[in-house]
Amino acid sequence: MEARDIILRPIVTEQSMAEMDNRKYTFEVALHATKPQVRKAVEEIFGVKVVNVNIANVRGKKKRQGRYEGMTRRRRKALIALSADSKEIKIFADEDNDKK
């Protein structure tokens, strides 16, 4: 399995943005991904040293559209802590490069 298939997208919330100052990043990962696979994928993609990986399964929520009821899809998110000597992950592109 490719590293890009394991790490799907960053999760951008107020809480996850605040944790970035402490070198903790939150990503949505594949449903079948394990902690060692997530660690290896992050180290391979971003070139950083991972200290800890925590994973949480998020249940789908019930949603209604008129009289029809359905479920949102379930997700799996990983909270990744980096070592103090590793570089930070650039999730957003620099605005200076976009303006050129």
Curated annotation (Swiss-Prot):
Top-level taxon in the UniProt lineage: Bacteria
InterPro entries xrefs: Nucleotide-bd_a/b_plait_sf (IPR012677), Ribosomal_uL23-like (IPR013025), Ribosomal_uL23/eL15/eS24_sf (IPR012678)
Gene Ontology MF terms: rRNA binding; structural constituent of ribosome
Pfam family, one: Ribosomal_L23
Gene3D superfamilies assigned: 3.30.70.330
Keyword terms, alphabetized: Ribonucleoprotein, Ribosomal protein, RNA-binding, rRNA-binding
Cellular component annotations (GO), alphabetically ordered: ribonucleoprotein complex; ribosome
GO BP of this protein: translation
Complex formation: Part of the 50S ribosomal subunit. Contacts protein L29, and trigger factor when it is bound to the ribosome.
Function of the molecule: One of the early assembly proteins it binds 23S rRNA. One of the proteins that surrounds the polypeptide exit tunnel on the outside of the ribosome. Forms the main docking site for trigger factor binding to the ribosome.
Family affiliation: Belongs to the universal ribosomal protein uL23 family.
Annotated protein name in UniProt: Large ribosomal subunit protein uL23
Source organism of the structure: Lacticaseibacillus paracasei (strain ATCC 334 / BCRC 17002 / CCUG 31169 / CIP 107868 / KCTC 3260 / NRRL B-441) (Lactobacillus paracasei)
Upper classification of the organism: Bacteria, Bacillati, Bacillota, Bacilli, Lactobacillales
Gene that encodes the chain: rplW
